[in-house]
Amino acid sequence: MTRVVPQSGSANLVRNKAIGPRGSDPLSRLLAHLIVRGGRTTEIERATSRPWASALFEGRRHIVRLRLHGPNAAERAAAYHEGIESAEFALPGHFVADIQVDASGQDQYGPWVEISALTIADW
């Protein structure tokens, strides 16, 4: 879907500024869903979000590294691999177009999981 914002003007295109209203970053809602999926003792070690766009869509690319703690942390970390691609995430104004576990492992601090996701603005 294409939007026209008459107030933007052509100078705006040259300066490469955002055109029209922008939605909020859905990263915080996505993190909340990932923590629920991992359990109460899930810790966010790192989370980044950057703009993403194609010819037809705009959204954000997210990379999240989670650390799981507790007696069954290894089992919960392994559970991230099962069904995350088909999981439903309620993100107002956005939807998860792609999500996957990129890497996982265990070190002296316990198991960790690195996840990448692409969220698209739902116009």
In which residue ranges do the predicted regions lie?
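Long, contiguous binding/interaction regions
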Residues: 1-123
